[in-house]
């Protein structure tokens, strides 16, 4: 009679690649009161040798690749190693205990495992004194899951994982493996199809098209403890973000700078230009360069295009040591259809949302995530926490939030299924975003979250406790659209579009806003910022300086995509570096210097950032001069209502040696910034000392200018400020109110 481990059914499942419980059959099994037996499976092997406590013994051969060796009772996994066909001598994977526990299962299947990145995927560890790599994956509909790699000849029958929960978690410890080992998952689906998949929880990947997962050893020694300790204090400070695509900021010898090369250069540049943060277009792994990183396949992995896992850690560490925060673009709304990654992961739409007639998103032809599954939410939440914990990022900007919030986003009637109340809101996505923000803010105070949200969905930046989504900031897409729409108009037509400047103030304090001029506005035929400006070269550059000054003065945090600060002429392309040679041209030098000094003024002026989400930080002075395109307003810090900045923007092309503004009673007025400075390439006008006029004198000036009739008694008289107003310029004054 054959021993139990040769049970025909067990062996058939093992040999056919459908065994879900290899740990029950293989490893050290008890044979009697006095004897154990080591049972091995080596498909294709004729002989197998075992080193047992220093002595080499040949295992007994059975049928179908099963080998065994009788041993004394109480043998341990450390006591023996097995010779493989490639000559490798290693401990037996099936002799070691399984570590995925009930608490892991409870938290993961509830969607609340906050350290899932230390449990799932390939985790280097030591079990019973033996080093190796523990592999864990979620594939509930697979009949068999194996880890394949160079270490087993990419043979799917050699290392099948053990199904450790009835909800589809699989585990195996492979002794002797170290960082750098390449691997993938091989799965047998319910229908018998064999799939080869990259690891959704993989921490690093080889380059496309192979896209193998790579084991990493996270042993980087950080030097940013002082930054992390002080980070929470910086959240209410100035925020001037430089948006960067790593692969096209600067090149060397025809290739993009890698993470390490970029680190010092970009950090010094940001300090020189007075940026407080960089925001990186996604550096998560992605197969397609042209997606700019927004079609992610490695949610836990930095892209290998620009260096190693440790190289990106070095980059972030270096930025912190120079006082620059790092924000990461992150895409939890959709993922690509590439068959090697998450799509149809275990033979079923495991991560995909399937309730709509077509599972593909009409805008990007990608899959959307199924937020109704706790495990999918845990996967995404774990990704965000991984980047904060292991990579020390200071903020996460969530891409395409609108597409997550609405079931009908980009879809016509009949192409989507309403929620259980008959509405269009994705209730599961809303719950996920609330969980995302709640966990991050509780676990990592000082880390900021940003929503790129283009609709009027309410309470984006209201706390979860008050019924909001809980983001720290929302991108003000309406302000960006209206502002650029106005600037693109030729000067004679601007008076008909004055509302583009004034309307955004009606909702400017309904959320905590960030004002972006992002990468999306300088691609796909939209033209660069300088290319949007009407007129000849002088007027274009004057308008760009005016635009940058306007952004700095408006209430809200700031973001500018790389190249905008020096007037990049061509549209951005991810396949080439910025046109840095333009800085040899005076116009570009001028706008670059202007941007630098505007940034410096911003970070040094609490009136521009200290209370920029409160209505009390902004007060109109005048927006009635539609014909000449002049608007003026005051900006306040919450500490001193008498100290303010007066911001004056002239969107026209005329020059006014004497321009009279109605103003509150002033004690003093001093010019701080003039974008028409000759150092910036301007005409040098606007530097005459402003004159503060009493109501009586101001009225006389208005009568003389024909602004009011002599017998006009409508409304009270107000003080006036007589300034020299240059063409197409921003003027910023420091004023003290009476």
UniProtKB/Swiss-Prot annotation:
Keyword terms: Carbohydrate metabolism, Glycogen biosynthesis, Glycogen metabolism, Glycosyltransferase, Transferase
A single Gene Ontology CC term: cytosol
EC number: 2.4.1.18
BP-aspect Gene Ontology terms: glycogen biosynthetic process
SUPFAM superfamilies listed in its UniProt record: (Trans)glycosidases, E set domains, Glycosyl hydrolase domain
GO MF term list: 1,4-alpha-glucan branching enzyme activity; cation binding; hydrolase activity, hydrolyzing O-glycosyl compounds
Location of the active site: 399, 452
Subunit structure: Monomer.
Family in the record: Belongs to the glycosyl hydrolase 13 family. GlgB subfamily.
Main function: Catalyzes the formation of the alpha-1,6-glucosidic linkages in glycogen by scission of a 1,4-alpha-linked oligosaccharide from growing alpha-1,4-glucan chains and the subsequent attachment of the oligosaccharide to the alpha-1,6 position.
Name this protein carries in UniProt: 1,4-alpha-glucan branching enzyme GlgB
Species this chain originates from: Chlamydia trachomatis serovar L2 (strain ATCC VR-902B / DSM 19102 / 434/Bu)
Organism placement in taxonomy: Bacteria, Pseudomonadati, Chlamydiota, Chlamydiia, Chlamydiales
Gene name per UniProt: glgB
């Amino acid at each position: 009679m054959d021993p139990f481990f040769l049970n025909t059914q067990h062996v058939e499942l093992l040999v056919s690649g459908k065994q879900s419980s290899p740990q029950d059959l293989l490893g050290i099994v008890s044979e009697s009161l006095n004897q154990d037996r080591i049972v091995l499976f080596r498909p294709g092997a004729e002989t197998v040798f075992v080193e047992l406590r220093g002595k080499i013994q040949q295992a007994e051969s059975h049928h179908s690749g099963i080998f065994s060796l009788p041993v004394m009772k109480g043998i341990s996994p450390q006591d023996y190693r097995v010779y493989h066909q490639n000559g490798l001598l290693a401990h037996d994977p099936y002799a070691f205990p399984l570590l995925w526990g009930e608490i892991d299962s409870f938290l993961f299947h509830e969607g609340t495992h906050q350290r899932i990145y230390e449990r799932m995927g390939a985790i280097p560890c030591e079990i019973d004194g033996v080093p190796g790599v523990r592999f864990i994956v979620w594939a509930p509909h697979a009949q068999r899951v194996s880890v394949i790699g160079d270490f087993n000849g990419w043979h799917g029958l050699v290392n099948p994982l053990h199904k450790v929960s009835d909800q589809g978690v699989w585990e195996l410890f492979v002794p002797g493996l170290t960082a750098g080992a390449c691997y993938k998952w091989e799965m047998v689906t319910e229908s018998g199809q064999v799939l080869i998949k990259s690891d959704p929880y993989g921490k690093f990947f080889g380059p496309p098209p192979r896209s193998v997962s790579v084991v990493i050893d996270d042993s980087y020694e950080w030097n940013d403890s002082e930054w992390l300790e002080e980070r929470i204090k910086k959240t209410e400070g100035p925020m001037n973000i430089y948006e960067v695509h790593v692969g096209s900021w600067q090149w060397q010898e025809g290739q993009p700078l890698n993470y390490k090369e970029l680190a010092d250069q970009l950090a010094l540049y940001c300090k020189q230009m007075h940026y407080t943060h960089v925001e990186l277009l996604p550096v998560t792994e992605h197969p397609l360069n042209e997606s700019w990183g927004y079609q992610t396949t490695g949610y836990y992995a930095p892209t290998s295009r620009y260096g190693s896992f440790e190289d990106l850690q070095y980059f972030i560490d270096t930025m912190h040591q120079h006082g620059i925060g790092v924000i990461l673009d992150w895409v939890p709304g959709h993922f690509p259809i590439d068959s090697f990654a998450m799509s149809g992961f275990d033979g079923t739409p495991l991560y995909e949302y399937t309730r709509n007639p077509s599972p593909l998103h009409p805008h990007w032809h990608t899959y959307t995530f199924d937020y109704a599954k706790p495990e999918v939410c845990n996967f995404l939440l774990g990704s965000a926490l991984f980047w904060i914990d292991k990579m020390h990022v200071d903020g996460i900007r969530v891409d395409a939030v609108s597409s997550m919030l609405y079931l009908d986003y980009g879809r016509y009637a009949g192409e989507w299924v309403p929620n259980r109340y008959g509405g269009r809101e994705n209730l599961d996505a809303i719950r996920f975003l609330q969980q995302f923000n709640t966990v991050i803010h509780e676990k990592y105070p000082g880390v900021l979250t940003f929503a790129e949200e283009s609709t009027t969905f309410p309470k984006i930046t209201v706390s979860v406790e008050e019924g909001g989504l809980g983001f720290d900031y929302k991108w003000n897409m309406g302000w960006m659209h209206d502002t650029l729409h106005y600037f693109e108009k030729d000067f004679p037509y601007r008076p008909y579009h004055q509302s583009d400047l004034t309307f955004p103030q009606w909702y400017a304090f309904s959320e905590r806003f960030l004002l972006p001029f992002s990468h999306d506005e300088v691609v796909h035929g939209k033209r660069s910022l300088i290319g949007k400006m009407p007129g000849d070269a002088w007027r274009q550059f004057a308008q760009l300086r005016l635009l940058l000054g306007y952004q700095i003065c408006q209430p809200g945090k700031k973001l500018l995509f790389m190249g905008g600060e020096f007037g990049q002429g061509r549209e951005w392309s991810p396949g080439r570096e910025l046109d840095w040679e333009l800085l040899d041209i005076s116009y570009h030098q001028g706008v670059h210097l202007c941007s630098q000094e505007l940034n410096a003024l911003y970070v040094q002026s609490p009136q521009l950032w200290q209370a920029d989400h409160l209505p009390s930080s902004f007060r109109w002075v005048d927006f009635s001069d539609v014909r000449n395109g002049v608007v003026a307003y005051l900006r306040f810090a919450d500490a001193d209502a008498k100290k303010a900045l007066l911001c004056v923007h002239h969107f026209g092309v005329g020059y006014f040696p004497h321009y009279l503004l109605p103003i509150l009673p002033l004690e003093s007025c001093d010019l701080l910034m003039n974008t028409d400075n000759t150092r910036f390439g301007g005409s040098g006008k606007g530097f005459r000392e402003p004159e503060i006029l009493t109501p009586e004198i101001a009225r006389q000036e208005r009568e003389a200018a024909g602004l009011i009739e002599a017998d006009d008694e409508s409304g009270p008289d107000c003080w006036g400020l007589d300034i020299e107003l240059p063409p197409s310029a921003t003027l910023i004054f420091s004023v003290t109110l009476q």
